[in-house]
Amino acid sequence: MKLSYLWRGLPGHPLHPPLTDATIGIYTFATLAGLVEVVGLTNRNGAIGWWLGLVFGLVATVPTALAGLADWLTITWGSELWWTATWHLLAMVSATVFFGLAAIFGHTAYTHANVSAGAYALTVIGFGLMTLGGWLGGAIVYVHGMRVLSLVDEPTERAVAPVPHPEKEMAEGS
């Protein structure tokens, strides 16, 4: 077992993608909770869910970003994959900045069980940037094929096994 498996995941089972699912889900919840408060569908619960969602999203961003950075550092500098991954990184960091600003500038309104228009606008901008970053992340995997092993004839029990096999390590180049 290699130490790098702790921050990069196993061959064929990278760590960054499942972490992004959780992080994107949390920020999506925060954006929707803020929306229901802004349009008046809730009287205070939307504001509480919005702000707590932003905070939990920011916490979840840390391991997600670190796992992504670990993958980014393995890419050949200046390659087309590197450019796509770098734009993905910039979009996601920008989204995080906007979500962070929304949490900071929206805290006072949150303490009064409200969502301010400015803080919610920052949330929506963050959500838009996150969506762009997700699109670019999809290109990294589905167009460039990063960390895709393409072992199409791998038996199911070996494909899903949480133990790295030599074929997987060789296919990933590790």
Regions found by a protein language model. Name each.
Residues 1-73, 77-174:
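Polytopic transmembrane helical bundles with strong interfacial aromatic enrichment
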